[in-house]
Amino acid sequence: LDAGRLSWNEPLQLSKTVVGGGAGWMASKPLGTRFPTHEVATEMIRVSDNTATNLLIERLGGQETLNARFNALGLSATKVNDWLPDLKGTNSTSARDLARSIALVDTGEALSIRSRDLFREVMGTSITNTLLPRGLLRGLGGRQGEPDDSLMVKGYRVLNKTGDIGIAYADAGLIELPDGSRAVAAFLVKGPFNDPRSTELIRKLAAAMAPVLKPKPAVARSSASAASIDP
């Protein structure tokens, strides 16, 4: 987008190559259906649409091109070797790479301010909040309810993206704190197929980091000012 080689409303066409099973709804549409890039990017994050992810992989030059770009960004553990859903687990990444990719965007090292804002908007659409957000809420204590709303009441916001292939679960996100500062967290757990202990471990790890994300109380500032008047 920043280089002008892709527009946010450019249509991407559904082909047999990119249709992926599993999560998402785009695979159910007829071949030849065209989706604007902004919808594809949003659905990739919002509902983890595998076909949407494949559409973007194809449009951005394919697996080898993306892998070279990941390597140039210092994401050495991240490699795309197969189209999604990749149930065999041939694609790879690390918690460090997940955290670094978010940090690169948030610090402005990888994207312009406008593209960074688009990134945040899209990340904010993710509907899965049962791992990192739920764990953080648990660690903060107090009222426990729906994670996003309950965190917002406490002054926190988590822009996160989850992923799983049954034997591995991940959640990474940008955490906005009550004092305006931000933090990045990423978790990646491998375990037995569909083992609930994997997701619970992510929640426990997120809860354990909560104490260090509690900002120091702000010093109250008086709005009153004193003035002397000569008689």
Outline where the language-model segments fall:
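A mature extracytoplasmic/lumenal domain signature
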Residues: 12, 16-18, 84, 187-189, ...
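Mid-domain, small-residue-enriched loop/turn segments at the edges of structured enzyme/sensor domains
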Residues: 36, 54-113
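Conserved catalytic neighborhood of penicillin-recognizing serine enzymes
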Residues: 17-55, 63
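Flexible glycine/proline-enriched surface loops and loop-helix/loop-strand junctions
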Residues: 36-40, 47-53, 81-86, 154-157, ...
